[in-house]
C-alpha cells in the first residue's frame, strides 16, 4: 500500500518475506550493525511518477558500529536473472515489478539482505539538491557541452553552464549532469552520480544537527520509500562523526565481465556465482 506520510512524502510498504533474502544470508547478517538500502533513480518524464526503468541503481551499505558507508553502484546494463522474466538487463526489473522485484533481483543475484529502499526521479533529485544549495563539481568541457545539450532538450529555459572546471551546479544542472551517458561510458556516468552523492553527504555534514529533522522531512517528501522519518534519522548521528566512504562498481575488474550483444541488446555478462 502506498501511503501519503505526515511529512509530505510517499511511504510504500514492501512484503519483506518476498524480497529474495536467502536463509543463509539472513542468518549471517541479520544481527550485525550493517544496514543495506537500495537507491533507485527512475527514468520517467512524469515529474510525479516513481515508475519506469531504474536508470540508476545503488546499494548504500551502512556500518553504524564502524561509521563506514559503502556506495555500490550496479551498472544498469548488467545481465541478471529477473524472477519471472529470465535473463535481462537489471534496469528492467523495476519496470516489471516496482521496488519489490528490483530489490528481489539484487538480493537473489548478489547475495544481499536488502529490505528497504528509496526511489527518486531526476526531477525530484533536482529539488533535493536545491534544498542543500546546489553542489560544486569539477566538470570537463565534454561534460559541460553534453550537460547543456540535455538540459536544453528538457527545458527551453535551462540555465547553461558557462565554463568547465570547478563549477557550482544548481539542482537541475546537477541532475542533468548525473544523466550524461552519450559522451563516454556507463562507468563514467556512475562516477558522475557518485560525485553528486558524495557532495550531498558533505553538504549534509555541515548542517547543524538541530536541522537534521527538517532536512530529512524535506528530502523524503521527494521520494517513494519503505522507510519512515525516524528510521532515516537514526543514521543522522553518523554525520557528526568522521565517516569513511568507499565507492564500488558492479561489475568490477575482478568480476571478469564481458560486454557485448546478447538477445539483441548490449549488456554486461559475468559469473555472479564466482
Which sequence ranges carry the predicted segments?
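Flexible, polar/acidic helix-loop-strand segments at domain edges
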Residues: 29, 50, 130-211
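Second-shell loop/turn segments in exported
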Residues: 46-49, 88-96, 111-116, 164, ...
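Amphipathic, coiled-coil-like alpha-helical scaffolding segments used for oligomerization/assembly
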Residues: 96-158, 226-232
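Entry/capping segment at the start of metal-dependent catalytic domains
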Residues: 1-67, 234, 240
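Extracytoplasmic
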Residues: 32-35, 52-57, 66-74, 85, ...
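Extracytoplasmic/secreted envelope proteins and their assembly/folding machinery
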Residues: 54-56, 87, 91, 99-107, ...
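Solvent-exposed, acidic/flexible segments
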Residues: 30-36, 42, 49-53, 83, ...
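C-terminal solvent-exposed extensions
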Residues: 47, 78-82, 86, 222-274
Amino acid at each position: 500500500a502506498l501511503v501519503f506520510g505526515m511529512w509530505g512524502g510517499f511511504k510504500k510498504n514492501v512484503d519483506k518475506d518476498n524480497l529474495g533474502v536467502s536463509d543463509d544470508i539472513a542468518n549471517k547478517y541479520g544481527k550485525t550493525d550493517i544496514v543495506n538500502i537500495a537507491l533507485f533513480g527512475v527514468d520517467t518524464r512524469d515529474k510525479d511518477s516513481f515508475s519506469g526503468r531504474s536508470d540508476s541503481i545503488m546499494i548504500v551499505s551502512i556500518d553504524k558500529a564502524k561509521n563506514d558507508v559503502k556506495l555500490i553502484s550496479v551498472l544498469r546494463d548488467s545481465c541478471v536473472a529477473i524472477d519471472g522474466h529470465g535473463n535481462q538487463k537489471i534496469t528492467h526489473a523495476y519496470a516489471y515489478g516496482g521496488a519489490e522485484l528490483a530489490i528481489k533481483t539484487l538480493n537473489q543475484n548478489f547475495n544481499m539482505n536488502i529490505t528497504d529502499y528509496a526511489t527518486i526521479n531526476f526531477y525530484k533529485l533536482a529539488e533535493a539538491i536545491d534544498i542543500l544549495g546546489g553542489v560544486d563539481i569539477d566538470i570537463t568541457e565534454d561534460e559541460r557541452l553534453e550537460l547543456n545539450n540535455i538540459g536544453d532538450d528538457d527545458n527551453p529555459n535551462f540555465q547553461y553552464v558557462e565554463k568547465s572546471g570547478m563549477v557550482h551546479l544548481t539542482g537541475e544542472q546537477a541532475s542533468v549532469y548525473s544523466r550524461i551517458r552519450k559522451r563516454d561510458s556507463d562507468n563514467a556516468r556512475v562516477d558522475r552520480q557518485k560525485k553528486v552523492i558524495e557532495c550531498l553527504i558533505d553538504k549534509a555534514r555541515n548542517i547543524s544537527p538541530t536541522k537534521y529533522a527538517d532536512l530529512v522531512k524535506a528530502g523524503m517528501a521527494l521520494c517513494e520509500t519503505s522507510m519512515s522519518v525516524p528510521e532515516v534519522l537514526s543514521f543522522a548521528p553518523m554525520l557528526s562523526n568522521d565517516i569513511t566512504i568507499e565507492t564500488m562498481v558492479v561489475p568490477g575488474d575482478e568480476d571478469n565481465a564481458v560486454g557485448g550483444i546478447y538477445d539483441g541488446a548490449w549488456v554486461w555478462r559475468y559469473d555472479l556465482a564466482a
